[in-house]
Design a protein with these regions (language model features):
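Acidic, mature catalytic/reactive cores of soluble proteins
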Residues: 1-209
Length: 209
């Protein structure tokens, strides 16, 4: 999700945040960070000292992720045969809205500072939470690759098909994903993931040809 400002190195895409643009480049890097953090926590088990605000935020995200498991866990139930199946599935707006509400509440809470209170959390618990996050992110990456016809994309834009008027403006109810021409940045970042040699070799051949 692009919230504003410049989306990256490519100045021609500066208007994408205004088109409900999203960048898969950050998604691939998020998956890498989750993989690294999970590995590090497993190597050094024990307890973590987290600021109260972040500890609460982490647990809230975990609850949202768990409550939306039926929707975002579709990748586990069956494999997608074609991108039409993903488009028919629709957007998981409930998950998106809840995650964004939690993010905005966290930002507002820490904007002027933190309480200074710290909570002890076991690395085992954090690893479980992060593994669940990684599963959700991986599912999203798999969907994106199918939408890209086997070549992992870098950017998407979204068209609002349905909306309702609310007090502060308009609330989107339904989106249509729009594909953007391929950028090499997407496949390059994807190749850094722990997806196995077979998938990477297949991607290489598709990009090459």
């Amino acid at each position: 999700e692009m919230e504003g400002g410049k989306p990256g190195w490519y100045d021609a895409l500066n208007g994408m945040p205004g088109m409900f643009g999203s960048s898969m480049a950050e998604t691939y890097e998020l998956a890498r960070m989750l993989e690294y953090t999970i590995g590090a926590l497993k190597r050094y088990p024990g307890e973590l000292e987290l600021i109260e605000e972040f500890s609460d935020f982490l647990q809230q995200l975990d609850l949202i992720n768990a409550s939306e498991k039926d929707a975002i866990g579709f990748c586990k139930k069956q494999s997608y045969a074609a991108k039409e199946e993903i488009q028919k599935e629709g957007e998981i707006l409930s998950f998106w809205n809840q995650i964004n509400d939690a993010k905005e509440a966290y930002r507002e809470k820490v904007f002027s500072g933190i309480s200074g209170v710290k909570n002890l959390v076991s690395t085992e618990k954090v690893v479980k939470i992060l593994n669940d996050f990684l599963e959700t992110v991986t599912c999203g990456i798999e969907k994106a690759c199918i939408l890209g016809n086997g070549i992992c994309p870098t950017y998407f834009t979204y068209e609002v098909l349905e909306y309702e008027k609310v007090k502060d403006g308009y609330k989107p109810l339904k989106f249509m994903v729009r594909e953007v021409p391929y950028f090499l940045e997407g496949p390059v970042r994807y190749l850094k993931l722990k997806t196995g040699k077979e998938k990477k070799a297949k991607l290489y051949e598709q990009v090459r040809h």
